[in-house]
Amino acid sequence: MLTEIPETIQTPAKPQSIWKIFVVFLLGALCFLVTQILTRVPLLGWLEKQTKFLLWAMSYPLFTGILIAMSAGISEESGRFAFKSLAIKPTKSQFWEPVVFGLGHGLCEAVWLLSPIWAMAGLLEPGQIVLAVVERLIAIAMHIGFSVMVWNGFQLDQRLRYLFLTILAHGLVNALIPLAGKFGLG
């Protein structure tokens, strides 16, 4: 059941060394860099140069938008899963770990996406900047939540189930963007 809280999360956390917290934070940021900047974004860039893909995307814009949204969920959540499996031990962990990992992931994404906005801040209305920052704060909270979901799969020994559910949740959240555009809400 998704509402179960694993025993290891219920126990009070032992004081963690700043170093371990910092490493988990950096691994979260690295996960974003690997799954998005070094992998998904270049693949999407290559794909949009393909004539057949462009024709297909223009024929089915909403479906294409939803598929691209789902690709973010697949990419990022598979990355979280791989980092937890390969780089962050033990399998059972304290609650702070996915929170710090998600914070690293989300802040790295925020810096990457907000940097161009800061570069042209003088040209924007204050409300536009506030809106961008609020959107990123919500996204950071979502990244923390997605990390907790993936980690719960490890805690409950239901890794693939939780990976699938997290990919689905992430994809559905991202699919709201093309859906909002389709209905004039974007």
Predicted feature locations:
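Hydrophobic alpha-helical segments at protein termini of multi-pass membrane proteins
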Residues: 1-186
